[in-house]
Amino acid sequence: MIFPKRPPMIEETPNNPSFSWNATAFFEDLTKRNKLAQKKGFTFCRVSGLDGFEELLGKMMTKTAFVCVSDISQGFTDINNTPHTRRVKTVFLAMRHAIDDMKARERCMNTMRELFRQFMSVLIMEQTRLQEHSIYVDPRISFQEIDRYFLSGCACAYFQIGVETYTDLQYNTDEWL
C-alpha cells in the first residue's frame, strides 16, 4: 500500500518550540494526488473565509471544481493545567453545474461527498503521525452542504477540522521590555 506523501510541518520558532500542522499543504497535496479529484478536474485554491474567494473567482472561467482551504481559522487557547491551542481549519469544496439543473447539482454533491470520504481515509493516517508530535485532530469532523444560493451554478460544501497543539505559556523575561 502506498500512502500519500507527507507534507512538511511548519518549522518551530525560537520562542515557541511547538510543532504546527500545515493544513493548506496537506490538502493541496491530497488534491493533486487523489484520482477522483484529478478525474473530476478539482483545482486547489487558498481563500480567506466565506468573504475571501478571490482566487476561486479568478479561476471559475477556466476550471469547474475546487478544493479551497481557508487561510484563517477560529480557535482558542486553554490556559488551564496543560496549556494548548485549538484551531479549526475550514476546507471548501465547489463544483460548477448548469444553473437550475438539480440533477447535475446532486451528481456534484455526490462527488464531493465521496471526495470528502477519500480525504478522511488519509486524514486517519495523518492523525496518527500528528499525535507523535502532540498534535491532536478532533475525530468529529463536520461536513456541511451549502444551499444552492451561495455561489450560483455551483454545488458547495465545506468541512471543518479541529486541531489542538501544546502551547508553551511559560513566562519569558526576554519577551518583555
Please provide the spans of the model-predicted regions.
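Short secondary-structure boundary/capping segments within folded domains
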Residues: 57-60, 80-81
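A short, hydrophobic beta-strand-centered structural micro-motif
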Residues: 59-74
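Short N-terminal edge-element motif at the start of the domain
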Residues: 44-58
